[in-house]
């Protein structure tokens, strides 16, 4: 089978590139492949009460139509530069902001609209001032929260639109290889069940998301495609009583606060705050980390957020992914395949937590399928020091987060995929192959991943 465009990965980057292509040119023959399942078939066994993680491959939470974001809490950050996302590396600031606005319009078209945060800009500015007085930095971002419980139906809406326009969607298609025979002839080999298929495309868009980062690196190594190693962020998922943070989260849903630690001078930040949310496991095929999400309709009595410290390696080893995986595997050895939970008091006092002490606390854990243990046995001393010092400083901004009963789950690791070297349209030099989204190191959240899809699609549209 021959196609004008083959898109590998049906996450935000892949979906938005397909949308842009078929909307602007209805004659294009497009195939969209994903190693995971369609929205209706993305069923995690843990959805049934009492069922532990089955280590499915592919993981229904991370892979499938909509990407890893489908079962996230659906926070949309409308900003061109945040964390590992920086669209201004590929275009001017004004063009990046315009692109973000265009991305928002498409989200809105498919009902992915919600109340805008900060809900009160004057109060948000006062909060930022309070953070600055405490010696830290608050980044104000235009945000919308869609909720984990509503995202699947929105993603289904995009998929229905694409299929109605003639895009071929192929689920559970595990791409094995991409072979370039000429600039405009590429052979994509994928496995579906026990069968192996080969399809041909004039243009290839590679967008397998975070779970495809390792595969992209293997592909780059195989064909000599240059890439740059990037930093990672390592830390914990912090869980506190919801009312402790409501004064801030009612105004700024997901406050991103940057803190400089004293001992090492490192930067640690809050990230992915979930008011009334739930701590969740994240399966990386071989090891388990933690994450968090929030539903639109169902709320817990707690709020959780990531508290992560940036790690950059220089020489002789620059492979930060391998470093992060090593920490995760140590945690899984100690937790017997499960994340570790520890009270802040126990971490400070240098003793492992036990469930009978955690259960006596004032915070009921929202993730029970974990092991009470000692995070100091998992993470380097430097990371633990940053967490403890960071929480002390954060307590000056949000009193109560440094309480003894505060719960810490670990490890939380934000892998920054190696960045494939491309031109500013994300295209390789001598082939019509594009690398976009999180897995290619070009984006780090739902909105910027979607934006990279628009850029690649528009470059293809100019040439077809």
What is the predicted function of each stretch?
Residues 56, 64-117:
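Dinucleotide-binding Rossmann-like beta1-alpha1 core, especially the glycine-rich loop
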Residues 1-80, 122-464:
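Residues forming the flavin
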